[in-house]
Amino acid sequence: HVVQVIDGGSVSKITDIKQATLEAVRNPIGTQALSKLVHEGDKVALIVSDITRTWSRTKDYLPAVVEELNNSGIPDADIFVIIATGTHRDNDDEEKRLILGDALFARLQVFDHDAYGSEANVFLGTTSRGTPVYIDKRAVEADKVILTGGITTHLFAGFGGGRKSVMPGLAGVETIKHNHLLALTDEVGGGVNQETYLTKIEGNRVSEDMCEVCAFLNPCFLVNSIMDAEGDFVRIVAGHWYDAWYAGTQE
């Protein structure tokens, strides 16, 4: 039996995705405009979600981000894409086209993150909760890192998007395992930690640990989409990797 159906409130849809994206990156939350954060000669890593997150429609707003980089003195040759797979499998070429769109797939170098390769990740330190921080070497060595993705609720991290592009997206397997164990109680057999659940951020140790992991990399910028129940854009948030994401979770 259906006990209850909960519908979201009515929200205006974005009709011009490119313009909405450009407005977001030029009027960001918590930091300077993207054009002021990058400089000629920078090697820029764009972090995108994998094939399991195509609902965020990266291919529809990422071209505007790349255009803004190009207009700010960053040519395609200095931009590369890392697919934030976490522990998921690699994406094949057809899936990469679905993520990026045909044009960007043809223009930019694209790499899958490898959570399991010891040479593929760099140790950056340890979080206050004891999580060893291993992050994708290509991202660590980039001059600038820009996170993309989409914001939605998450079963034990409160919300997806934001810092999840780094943890688990760009993290080594030991980092991911230690972080995800925080969703359980400290007692053997104690089950699920009751402070880790949908929409909870403050006091959610999984989310807080993810933020600590992300801070080790300290991306320079973030662009995240927010979608309605029909899969249409209702907002693009951009800016500081935490502040802009947090603002998006409060929509």
Task: Label every model-predicted segment.
Residues 158-177:
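A short, gly/pro- and small-residue-rich
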Residues 90-160:
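An acidic, phosphate/nucleotide-engaging active-site surface
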Residues 4-6, 15, 55-56, 147-148, ...:
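Short helix/loop capping segments that flank catalytic or ligand/cofactor-binding pockets
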Residues 1-24:
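N-terminal amphipathic/basic leader segments beginning at the initiator methionine
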Residues 76-87, 224:
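Short internal beta-strands
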Residues 29-47, 73-76, 217:
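Glycine-rich phosphate/diphosphate-binding loops that line cofactor/substrate pockets in enzymes
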Residues 191-251:
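Membrane-embedded hairpin module used as a gating/binding unit in multi-pass transport
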Residues 54-74:
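Histidine-anchored nucleotide/phosphate-binding helix
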